[in-house]
Amino acid sequence: MEKTFVMVKPDGVQRQLIGEILLRFERKGLQLIGAKLMKVSEETAGEHYKEHNGKPFFGELVDFITSGPVFAMVWEGEDAIAVARQLIGKTNPKEALPGTIRGDFGMFVGKNIIHGSDSPESAAREINLFFKEDELVEDEKLMNQWIY
């Protein structure tokens, strides 16, 4: 099964959207195998957004992600990355379809509620950045036989 990293950003946490987001992912059939409410250090934020280092908006990304608590998660399932990206919607909430998390709750690109890995490589890197191996609980659920 594929794993993906998803993070409710500070705006989503402050707007109390964690429960709604968890519900959408669970109803879709993904399995939560790791989760924690945490503050992101500047060092971790810089590593998380390293592909944007040197771009004009890099500082804003780091400032925003360190401005308050985030809810970091690891989800597992068939095509988990693509499924999560579909649930999340386009980066710019104004372009995100209704029914997606960003389409329903996002206001503008700078505060777009949620982050999701965009490839197996970024998922592995982000999971390793935010979680220790012993923080992930992989358990074969009986429901998997009804989904996959």
Swiss-Prot record:
Subunit comment: Homotetramer.
Main EC class the enzyme belongs to: transferase
CDD domains hit by this protein: NDPk_I
Cellular localization per UniProt: Cytoplasm
Protein name according to UniProt: Nucleoside diphosphate kinase
One cellular-component annotation, GO: cytoplasm
UniProt keyword terms in alphabetical order: ATP-binding, Cytoplasm, Kinase, Magnesium, Metal-binding, Nucleotide metabolism, Nucleotide-binding, Phosphoprotein, Transferase
Cofactor field: Mg(2+)
GO molecular function: ATP binding; metal ion binding; nucleoside diphosphate kinase activity
Enzyme Commission number(s): 2.7.4.6
Species for this entry: Bacillus licheniformis (strain ATCC 14580 / DSM 13 / JCM 2505 / CCUG 7422 / NBRC 12200 / NCIMB 9375 / NCTC 10341 / NRRL NRS-1264 / Gibson 46)
Main location: cytoplasm
Binding-site residues for ATP, renumbered to this chain: 9, 57, 85, 91, 102, 112
Domain of life: Bacteria
